[in-house]
């Protein structure tokens, strides 16, 4: 019996091995693309930026590729690139969700399987159009690139990312053009370069034509880099300045959890921030304003709740510093019964040394699914009991600007809390409402020493370029930094260390609205027109060949 069991087991294992070996060979180009994309995104150098999707797209232009086969090839690519770039999902599920490691890894695999399905949908749709309208290989490549560009900005995802962000990460000056087309527009340009590289590959047997296209591609890329460099110079004008000191207390995850549960850690955390702020003021006595990260003050800070114990501790520590403070904290309406009402908000406050609210607090609007609210919990409240570790914050009405009056004039701070810095439309709203300086407060402690802190950092800094407003970023564990409207990134804090630093924030008073702020993602119209033209030309050529 044991011998029979061993024989059956070995036979099954061999069959499974042969099956996966065969599939791996079939999808070798899809696997290669997944690796290229995953290792060209933040925090890796963008070494394959303009050809990372090319192997996948060339594969689906082959005559033997069906819609079904193309979809699964795209699925393999998105699974691998997600596994590389978003491996931190498992760590976060374990730390934030307090799930066992086995369940956390399962959550990662599910995330990889379903989160970026727009990639296989784009290649499958491109294949269908190729078969339906008899598109050539080159036309199919550009069709897929344009479909991908449209889908990545409309497909519902938890974390919006694309290849445009690699430009600011790697300091390729083309990123300066984001104030014209946004980083989504730059991503579309990168995708078109991928299609162009694929076209060069398809024409490799025609050496002269392939080399001419490769040369033209290189010249076009160089021209865009040069244009970006020249365009960025226009934002070197400043007529305002404020000195902001950011305090990073490096509060651990368990301490944050205990503070949220109302334990003694609330006082410990408050005093730690005050002590670090006192030391920072001695080091930077010219500071105009202090900035603490998301929920750095782990209690309510509304004007009507300043008599609470921890608010009084905060006030007693702020008074000797004689500086206003921007900090994350919790907020609640005056009419709310704290014991019964659940409308607690994740908020951003601007207070004077006496704790007085200098403007109404900004309450977070773009809540993180499964982190700050549970989808469908309003319709099915029992879900909150099944998943008690998921927070249930109220939703604010942003974007909103906080006004700070100084002897030199008013400064308008445009607040972003955590992942709100990833939404271009949100920051456009802040610029439209007159924000002079953007301030992003966040807590990346849940992600450990993974890729996420660097990804989150540069995806947030990108908003400053789109709207051409300086941005100060205050985090609990790093990376805290600031970027000016001209793209200059100032000093950056270390990860997972106590730290404080002063940033001289130069800005332009009443700065003009950028083209992107005024018109948004206008380029989708161009993408649709070009897509229609490519498909239409392919269809006409096919008809003429038949006739």
Swiss-Prot record:
Gene3D superfamilies the record matches: Carbon-nitrogen hydrolase (3.60.110.10)
Lipid bilayer topology: Multi-pass membrane protein
GO biological process, one term: lipoprotein biosynthetic process
Lineage: superkingdom: Bacteria
A GO-annotated cellular component: plasma membrane
Protein name: Apolipoprotein N-acyltransferase
Gene name linked to the record: lnt
Known pathway: Protein modification; lipoprotein biosynthesis (N-acyl transfer)
């Amino acid at each position: 019996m044991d011998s029979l069991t061993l024989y059956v087991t070995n036979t099954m294992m061999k069959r499974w091995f042969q099956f996966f070996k065969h599939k791996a060979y079939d999808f070798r180009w899809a696997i290669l693309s997944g690796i290229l994309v995953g290792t060209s995104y933040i925090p890796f150098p963008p070494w394959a930026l303009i050809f990372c999707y090319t192997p996948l797209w060339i594969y689906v232009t082959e005559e033997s590729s069906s819609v079904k086969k193309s979809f699964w090839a795209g699925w393999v690519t998105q699974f691998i690139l997600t596994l590389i770039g978003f491996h931190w999902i498992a760590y976060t599920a374990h730390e934030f969700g307090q799930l066992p490691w086995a369940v956390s890894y399962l959550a990662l695999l599910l995330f990889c399987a379903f989160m970026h399905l727009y990639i296989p949908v784009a290649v499958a749709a491109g294949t269908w159009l190729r078969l339906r309208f008899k598109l050539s290989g080159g036309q199919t490549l550009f069709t897929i690139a344009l479909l991908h560009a449209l889908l990545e900005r409309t497909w519902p995802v938890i974390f919006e990312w694309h290849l445009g962000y690699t430009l600011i990460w790697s300091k390729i000056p083309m990123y300066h053009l984001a104030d014209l087309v946004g980083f989504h527009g730059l991503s579309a340009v990168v995708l078109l370069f991928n299609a162009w590289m694929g076209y060069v590959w398809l024409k490799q047997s025609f050496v002269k034509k392939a080399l001419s296209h490769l040369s033209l591609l290189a010249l076009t890329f160089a021209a865009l880099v040069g244009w970006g460099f020249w365009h960025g110079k226009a934002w070197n004008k400043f007529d305002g300045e404020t000195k902001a000191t950011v305090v990073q207390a490096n509060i651990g995850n368990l301490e944050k959890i205990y503070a949220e549960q109302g334990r003694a850690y609330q006082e410990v955390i408050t005093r730690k921030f005050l002590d670090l702020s006192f030391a920072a003021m001695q080091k930077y006595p010219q500071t105009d304003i202090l900035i603490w990260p998301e929920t750095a003050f782990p209690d309510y800070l509304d004007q009507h709740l300043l008599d609470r114990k921890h608010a009084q501790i905060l006030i007693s520590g702020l008074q000797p510093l004689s500086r206003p403070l921007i900090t994350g904290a919790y907020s609640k309406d005056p009419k709310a019964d704290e014991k019964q009402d659940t409308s607690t908000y994740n908020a951003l406050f601007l207070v004077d040394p006496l704790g007085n609210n200098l403007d109404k607090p900004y309450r977070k609007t773009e809540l993180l699914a499964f982190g700050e609210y549970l989808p469908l919990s309003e319709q099915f409240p029992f879900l909150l009991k099944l998943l008690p570790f998921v927070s249930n914050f109220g939703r604010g009405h942003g974007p909103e600007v906080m006004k700070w009056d100084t002897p030199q004039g008013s400064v308008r701070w445009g607040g972003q809390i955590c992942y709100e810095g990833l939404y271009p439309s949100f920051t456009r709203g802040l610029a439209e409402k007159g924000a002079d300086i953007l301030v992003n407060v966040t807590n990346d402690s849940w992600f450990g020493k993974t890729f996420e802190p660097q990804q989150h950092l540069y995806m947030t800094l990108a908003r400053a370029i789109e709207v051409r407003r300086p941005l100060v970023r205050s985090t609990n564990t790093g990376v805290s930094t600031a970027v000016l409207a001209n793209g200059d990134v100032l000093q950056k804090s270390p990860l997972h260390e106590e730290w404080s630093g002063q940033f001289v924030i130069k800005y332009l008073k009443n700065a003009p609205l950028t083209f992107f702020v005024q018109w948004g993602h206008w380029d989708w119209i161009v993408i649709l027109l070009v897509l229609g033209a490519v498909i239409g030309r392919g269809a006409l050529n096919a008809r003429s060949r038949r006739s």
